[in-house]
């Protein structure tokens, strides 16, 4: 027997009242986006659950993808069976013989949406339970927390049987909590921040600052690969590459070394905010962790934040580095993040950066620069690429080779 569908149950969506169907429909679209690499798979969303029809597609890779999608509480692979008592008896006996081990307990739970079926739920439980006893005489029934719970659903088109319940990622469907711009450096922290924002339903676009020739094509590919890792949690992500060379050279030439990092981050924040406004997002997200580096003291955050009134979400701000690394390993971004490519935040990093910069000093040094002109030129020069769950990596590799 082969699985024919997967039944998906919702998590926090049960608390969403009148907005429930909006959340469910968004989850459906996210599932369709992530599973788009399986053309035979069909997704149908109902108020109480979503049905994923496999149509011959291998169950295992689909299940691995579903485990990552936010908004799913759990799911169960199911067998499609002819809607008749003899067919159900045969299927239940076959399944139990496959999964039963000595000493296990079981329970039958039946549900009918087709009330014209010849047996009601209670009668079906009894009939199928008797069939299990015939196949495995020594098996014991247990109504609470059995080792094996066979779930039987009688629908209009067929009957479905399942016995596994696999835990999902929980959280909220991506896109149900607004939209944010993720400042993605290529390090360990910012992809984790993006993941945690996705978990709470925030639709993200990744903003990456590139300063060629100081930053390499490898650094750009690294950031795109990190973005691709995040797509498995909610579908395609827009990757926004910002040209940053001119700005960094101007800062390096005209500002004191101690304030290089502060001014660099202030420009990044301004540019991200301008892109946010143009693309209809509500928040900025970054991977700052309090006290981890010189630019992540409270004083530095205050000086950098002063250039925007937009809310800045810092999902990892109170985490230790080891806590962040643990999540990075879980979401499979860690090995990419530690690849030895320099990013914009490291190429001109001063030996003794200011840990308690003053806003008035930052503004004084910025007066030496054409701030608005530099920001406008950077925003005008952005390049946007849609990153998919399994992008055509050959095309990306060809692009990198061309740049090299």
Curated annotation (Swiss-Prot):
| UniProt GO cellular component terms | cytosol
Q: What is its EC number?
A: 2.8.1.4
Matching SUPFAM superfamilies, A to Z? Adenine nucleotide alpha hydrolases-like, THUMP domain-like
Q: What pathway, per the record?
A: Cofactor biosynthesis; thiamine diphosphate biosynthesis
Give the highest taxon in the source lineage: Bacteria
Key word Metal-binding present? no
Supply the PROSITE patterns for this chain.
THUMP
Q: Which residues form the THUMP domain?
A: 60-165
The places in or outside the cell where this protein is found are: Cytoplasm
Keywords recorded for this protein, A-Z:
ATP-binding, Cytoplasm, Nucleotide-binding, RNA-binding, Thiamine biosynthesis, Transferase, tRNA-binding
Catalysed reaction per UniProt? [ThiI sulfur-carrier protein]-S-sulfanyl-L-cysteine + a uridine in tRNA + 2 reduced [2Fe-2S]-[ferredoxin] + ATP + H(+) = [ThiI sulfur-carrier protein]-L-cysteine + a 4-thiouridine in tRNA + 2 oxidized [2Fe-2S]-[ferredoxin] + AMP + diphosphate; [ThiS sulfur-carrier protein]-C-terminal Gly-Gly-AMP + S-sulfanyl-L-cysteinyl-[cysteine desulfurase] + AH2 = [ThiS sulfur-carrier protein]-C-terminal-Gly-aminoethanethioate + L-cysteinyl-[cysteine desulfurase] + A + AMP + 2 H(+)
Similarity comment text for this entry: Belongs to the ThiI family.
Protein name, please?
Answer: Probable tRNA sulfurtransferase
Report which gene this protein is encoded by.
thiI
């Amino acid at each position: 027997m082969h699985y024919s569908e997967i039944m998906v149950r919702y998590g926090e969506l049960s608390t969403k009242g009148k907005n429930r169907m909006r959340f469910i429909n968004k989850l459906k679209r996210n599932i369709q986006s992530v599973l788009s690499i399986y053309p035979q798979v069909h997704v149908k969303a109902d108020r109480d659950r979503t049905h994923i029809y496999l149509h011959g597609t291998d169950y295992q890779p689909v299940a691995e993808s579903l485990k990552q999608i936010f908004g799913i509480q759990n799911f169960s692979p199911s067998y499609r069976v002819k809607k008749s008592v003899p067919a159900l008896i045969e299927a239940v006996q076959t399944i139990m013989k496959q999964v039963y081990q000595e000493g296990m307990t079981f329970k039958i739970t039946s549900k009918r949406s087709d009330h014209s079926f010849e047996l009601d739920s209670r009668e079906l439980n009894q009939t199928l339970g008797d069939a299990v006893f015939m196949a495995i005489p020594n098996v014991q029934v247990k109504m609470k927390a059995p080792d094996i719970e066979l779930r039987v659903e009688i629908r209009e088109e067929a009957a479905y049987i399942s016995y596994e319940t696999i835990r999902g990622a929980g959280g909220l469907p991506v896109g149900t909590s607004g939209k944010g711009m993720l400042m993605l450096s290529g390090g360990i922290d910012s992809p984790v921040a993006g993941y945690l924002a996705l978990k709470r339903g925030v639709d993200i676009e990744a903003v990456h600052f590139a300063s060629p020739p100081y930053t390499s094509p490898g650094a750009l590919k690294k950031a795109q690969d990190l973005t691709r890792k995040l797509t498995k949690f909610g579908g395609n992500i827009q990757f926004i590459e910002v040209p940053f060379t001119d700005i960094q050279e101007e800062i390096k030439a005209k500002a004191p070394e101690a304030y290089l990092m502060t001014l660099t981050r202030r420009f990044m924040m301004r540019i991200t905010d301008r892109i946010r406004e143009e693309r209809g997002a509500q928040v900025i997200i970054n991977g700052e962790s309090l006290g981890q580096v010189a630019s992540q003291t409270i004083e530095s955050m205050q000086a950098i934040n002063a250039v925007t009134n937009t809310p800045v979400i810092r999902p990892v701000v109170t985490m230790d580095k080891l806590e962040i690394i643990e999540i990075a390993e879980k979401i499979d971004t860690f090995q990419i993040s530690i690849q030895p490519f320099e990013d914009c935040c490291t190429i001109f990093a001063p030996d003794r950066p200011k840990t308690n910069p003053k806003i008035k000093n930052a503004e004084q040094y910025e007066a030496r620069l054409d701030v608005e002109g530099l920001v406008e030129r950077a925003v005008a020069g952005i390049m946007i690429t849609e990153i998919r769950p399994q992008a055509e990596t050959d095309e990306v590799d060809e692009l990198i080779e061309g740049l090299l």
